[in-house]
């Protein structure tokens, strides 16, 4: 893979796409920021939890992007193969294995949260779950499309169907005017 791909940058760009394209995300992100501010003032490990969450998002982006490229090549070599939701199950397993230790460390800190801060932490969970849902799917799609640039005749119809499915599934346009990822 080319050096130009930087996992943290791409996860930040996906978050920017969500901010501009997904009506639900703005409220979730605002609640997350407010919860983080409250948690920071009352819980000393908040910044470490946030860093773990950012690290997980970056790994999700990197792994999904790479898997998208691999799936594109696999599709190129086996054009009768159909892209399906099963790709995401495989991807989720890969991500789970790679982020397991980070999640374990984060959970150790979360267990230290005083009961009075659990309601504030719920907004952190909602934000994290939102990213866990959107980032791998979008990054996989971008990897799949990026794989078309590897000097072969891409099947643009498959990419179009993938984009249409993803747009319907996530409720956003992955190649919209605010998207600087492709």
Enumerate the language-model features and the residues they cover.
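Hydrophobic/aromatic hotspots within intrinsically disordered, low-complexity regions
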Residues: 181-182
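Intrinsic-disorder/low-complexity detector
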Residues: 1-177
């Amino acid at each position: 893979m080319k050096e130009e791909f930087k996992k943290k940058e791409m996860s930040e760009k996906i978050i920017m796409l969500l901010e501009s394209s997904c009506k639900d995300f703005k409220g979730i992100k605002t609640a997350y920021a407010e919860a983080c501010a409250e948690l920071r003032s009352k819980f000393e490990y908040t910044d470490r939890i946030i860093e773990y969450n950012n690290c997980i998002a970056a790994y999700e982006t990197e792994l999904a992007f790479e898997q998208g490229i691999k799936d594109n090549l696999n599709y190129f070599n086996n054009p009768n193969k159909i892209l399906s939701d099963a790709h995401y199950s495989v991807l989720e397993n890969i991500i789970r294995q790679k982020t397991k230790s980070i999640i374990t460390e984060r959970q150790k800190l979360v267990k230290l949260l005083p009961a009075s801060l659990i309601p504030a932490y719920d907004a952190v969970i909602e934000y994290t779950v939102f990213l866990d849902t959107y980032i791998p799917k979008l990054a996989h799609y971008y990897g799949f499309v990026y794989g078309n640039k590897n000097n072969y005749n891409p099947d643009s119809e498959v990419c179009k169907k993938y984009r249409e499915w993803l747009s319907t599934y996530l409720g956003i346009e992955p190649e919209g005017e605010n998207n600087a990822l492709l």
